[in-house]
Amino acid sequence: MPAIAVLAAAAAAWCFLQVESRHLDALAGGAGPNHGNFLDNDQWLSTVSQYDRDKYWNRFRDDDYFRNWNPNKPFDQALDPSKDPCLKVKCSPHKVCVTQDYQTALCVSRKHLLPRQKKGNVAQKHWVGPSNLVKCKPCPVAQSAMVCGSDGHSYTSKCKLEFHACSTGKSLATLCDGPCPCLPEPEPPKHKAERSACTDKELRNLASRLKDWFGALHEDANRVIKPTSSNTAQGRFDTSILPICKDSLGWMFNKLDMNYDLLLDPSEINAIYLDKYEPCIKPLFNSCDSFKDGKLSNNEWCYCFQKPGGLPCQNEMNRIQKLSKGKSLLGAFIPRCNEEGYYKATQCHGSTGQCWCVDKYGNELAGSRKQGAVSCEEEQETSGDFGSGGSVVLLDDLEYERELGPKDKEGKLRVHTRAVTEDDEDEDDDKEDEVGYIW
């Protein structure tokens, strides 16, 4: 009987051992070939991917970084090392963690790691632990500007670039501000060679063109506004305030002098600035500003248009004298000049006996050439030179002179000056407004 009890106990123990052995084998078989490392299990890896789809993993990452992330690029696209997937994975002692992309972490055997790296199958070996990150300065949580690194990857800040360089041991530098790729730097604008100072000839030509323009405006004004016998006295200018040049230049000066201080300030001169078409207009008026105060007085304005060397008839006479060199030029035409150096209205050729009419620049008037003497009306304008104002008056002054009567014994008109009232000025302004000039 005792022997039977011993055999029964032994049989029960053997059965228990068999059951436990099978249970352990079943557990071992479920672990797969990687014995004991559940992190290498495919089911666990799929769970990591599921976390990514559910947005659990990304909440630990930099939102501003992944906003610009391109999954098609390799992993060395400058992930934030502090958010590396391997930091959350703990491999067995004989394995090391590597990342296959920005969301997948794998535990790989150390003995298989080096051969796979040589073949290039593993993108990058990551840190065994966070010890390498201790020496790198972390970046503050603050909004910053994105930069492009020398490795061709975009970083959310310069600090992130430096952190990545520190943690990986790479030598990185900032190529440009903003995301990669860096746009080519625009070529520095080719500055046009600054225009050299205007020559005296250019200034004289410009002054001559401006005088012609002022003359045309003045002529149109006198043609449109015809003073009548009833309002002539009230509508004429007070000649005592006119500049020293009393032709179209004086008329233009008074048109520009809006505050009637006999000075043209820059705002008043700007009314005739044509920089786009006349690049020398500013140099012209700057050269006339003798006192360098930024304003033109009436004398400076008049002198501005009588630069020496700009007198057409006098220049022609000088040219003829140089050609003759003391010899008599028989049969040659010799022009007639006035005291200001411009052409007289009537010109005659002594050899042919023909006469014709010209303007002050010597241009012949069409149909005026005749055999013998011709009657040419003298110009109503002079060059604007000093002293020329006494011989020529404005058209509206001529109408006024006809009412005053004959000249005195010395041939001078008897002019009675009177003060200009505010009502007279208002009437004159109203007439000017009706014309509608465009300066």
UniProtKB/Swiss-Prot annotation:
Residues 415-439 are annotated as: Disordered. Disulfide bonds join C86-C97, C91-C107, C136-C166, C139-C159, C148-C180, C313-C337, C348-C355, C357-C376. It is found in: Secreted, Extracellular space, Extracellular matrix. Glycans are attached at T228, S383, S388. Residues 310-376 form the Thyroglobulin type-1 domain. Residues 422-439 have a biased composition (Acidic residues). O-glycosylated. Glycosaminoglycan that contains chondroitin sulfate and heparan sulfate. Gene3D superfamilies: 3.30.60.30, EF-hand, Thyroglobulin type-1. May play a role in cell-cell and cell-matrix interactions. May contribute to various neuronal mechanisms in the central nervous system. This is Testican-1.
